C-alpha cells in the first residue's frame, strides 16, 4: 500500500485525516504513533516528521506534514468529491479562508485551553493558576462564539451548503475540549446543529475516530476535573 498515515487518535488533526481518508475510501496503511509512550520522539519517526508531531503521511516515498497541507494534497491527488475542496476558485477561497483563520483561532484557542487545563498539570504535577486558566478559557469561548455567530450564522457548514475539509478539521478540534469538562454546544444552537451534521455526514468514521476520546472524557468526568475552571 503506497499511502501511510502516521497518527494517534488523541490528536485532533490525526482524527480529521483518519476520518477524511475513510469517508473518501482512500486506501491507506495506518501507522499508530503512541504519543503517551513518546513514540513520536523516536529517531526513526523524525525521518518522517522532522518536528516529531502527528499526523504525517508518506505517499510513494514522499513525506508530508501539517494536516491542512496534507488534506489539500489528498484532494488534488485522489478522486474525491469536489465539495471537499472545490476546484471553483471562489468556492475554494471560502474553504481557505476558514483554514487560514483556524490556525490562530479554533486550533490555537481550543488546543491551548485543553493543554493548560489537562496536559500541563499531568506533565508537571502542578495545577494551572485559576486566573491564568480563565484567560485561556475566555479566548476559547470567544472563538466558539465566533463560529456560532459568524461562520455558522446562515449556513449549514463552515464555508457553504456542503461539507468540506474545513468542517472535519474544525469539529475535531472542538471535540477535544469535552475532555476537560467543557460543553462547546451549550447556548450555541448553530454550532450544535453543525457538529451533528458533520458527524452524520462522516458516519460511522467520525464516531469511530472519537471512541478513545469519549472514553477518556468519561474517565475525566468521574475524576471530577469538570468542576475545575
Task: Give names to the regions the model predicted.
Residues 80, 149-161, 202-209:
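Surface-exposed helix-capping loop/turn segments at secondary-structure junctions
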Residues 105, 109-114, 158-186, 192-198:
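GST superfamily/GST-like fold recognition
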Residues 111-112, 209-211:
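Short coil/turn segments at secondary-structure boundaries
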Residues 211-229:
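C-terminal helix/juxtamembrane-tail motif
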